[in-house]
Amino acid sequence: MSRFDEKKQLKCSFCGKSQDQVRRLIAGPNVYICDECIELCQEIIQEEFDESIDLDLMDLPKPSEIKDILDQYVIGQEKAKKALAVAVYNHYKRINVEDVKSGDVELQKSNILMLGPTGSGKTLLAQTLAKIINVPFAIADATSLTEAGYVGEDVENILLKLIQAADYDIERAEKGIIYIDEVDKIARKSENPSITRDVSGEGVQQALLKILEGTVASVPPQGGRKHPHQEFIQIDTTNILFIVGGAFDGIDSIIQKRTSKKSMGFGAEIESKQVLDLGSLLKQIQPEDLLKFGLIPEFVGRLPVVVTLEQLDEEALIKILTEPKNALTKQYKRLFEIDGVHLEIEEEALRLIAKKAIERKTGARGLRGIVEGIMMDTMYEIPSRDDIEKVIITAEAITENKEPKILLKEDVKPKLDKKENEESVS
């Protein structure tokens, strides 16, 4: 019930202050609330919300649970998934410890370096990890970054993407994950330091060092370059997990050169020319190989966890097409269902799609492009027609560039009626 004094003056139903004592009085059905009580309620709700976030972080899934969820989205890469699950679990366990400097032991951050061929699942793994832990996630492309003062993006813009992903909640952003892709493209052009300035290579590596290790960075709220007269967002990167990834084309020859036996003289063994696949070579990677490739020692030192991904074979690509929760075939079947059409893809067609992706050396990333190309004309036609019952992707659609097989409702219905009659007779 609304509250009045003797002079019929309006009062807040919660604190009893009169209309003259507050800035604003908001009316409801027979009740009033002042701006001060609204602010107090907001503070109480925010405190409860912050506590719930802390509780969520304390309920961190175990490495085996993280891997089980990764298995639902990412096919193969068993060792990589285990290594990532352990690294992410340890990182957030470190954050959850109330006093990380208890005693003489300081728990330091372990950022992750992921190496693997194009389309092997680096980005998908990082995205899925962020979903599992329920933290803000941002992807940045290392090729667009340049050293401060040059044309291109400053490294602080990476942090802005994370802040935006957290809806400008700085506290949440400070516990997020940033994935920096194409990090191999910022390798310096030669192993020896150059006299000329390498603003998109070594310069970017130098600029990334501080935020990788942990610092309070000043981020321009609108992005772009910094200038002296603007306000900055302050963000502490100490608890942000950085995952950097790249294909590192050519590093296999560096590893092969280091691991192959060499000797001289008449009794010398001939240099072993054992041909190993890319995945097997990457498993033998050492920090010295990364230095030879063009990463600077300080940068390598800030990425203690190295995870290698294998090249996806035909069987793995077929599984990627059919098995994950968001598998490509499931996505297209759903798209066709919306238009009232059933989609079927023959086993041999799936195998040929996988082979084509291997030939193009695009890995899992190239699968969508191949499938899209096969079905483009059919998907263009279906919404304009209501007589199509089923579309079948055959092997000929891939090998001979034929159109997928279309079954009309008038052809399918008589067969179904005949089958039902036979079953009823028997």
From Swiss-Prot:
GO molecular function: ATP binding; ATP hydrolysis activity; ATP-dependent protein folding chaperone; protein dimerization activity; unfolded protein binding; zinc ion binding
Binding site for ATP: P117, T118, G119, S120, G121, K122, T123, L124
GO biological process entries: cell division; proteolysis involved in protein catabolic process
SMART domains per record: AAA, ClpB_D2-small, zf-C4_ClpX
Transcription regulation recorded as keyword: no
Keyword Magnesium among record annotations: no
Record SUPFAM superfamilies: Glucocorticoid receptor-like (DNA-binding domain), P-loop containing nucleoside triphosphate hydrolases
Binding site for Zn(2+): C12, C15, C34, C37
Alphabetic keyword roster: ATP-binding, Chaperone, Metal-binding, Nucleotide-binding, Zinc
Classification via Pfam families: AAA_2, ClpB_D2-small, zf-C4_ClpX
Every ClpX-type ZB domain range: 1-53
This protein's GO CC annotations: HslUV protease complex
Transmembrane segments: none
Functional note: ATP-dependent specificity component of the Clp protease. It directs the protease to specific substrates. Can perform chaperone functions in the absence of ClpP.
Protein family per UniProt: Belongs to the ClpX chaperone family.
Quaternary context: Component of the ClpX-ClpP complex. Forms a hexameric ring that, in the presence of ATP, binds to fourteen ClpP subunits assembled into a disk-like structure with a central cavity, resembling the structure of eukaryotic proteasomes.
PANTHER family assigned: ATP-DEPENDENT CLP PROTEASE ATP-BINDING SUBUNIT CLPX-LIKE, MITOCHONDRIAL (PTHR48102:SF7), ATP-DEPENDENT CLP PROTEASE ATP-BINDING SUBUNIT CLPX-LIKE, MITOCHONDRIAL-RELATED (PTHR48102)
Protein name per its UniProtKB record: ATP-dependent Clp protease ATP-binding subunit ClpX
Naturally occurring in which organism (per UniProt): Alkaliphilus oremlandii (strain OhILAs)
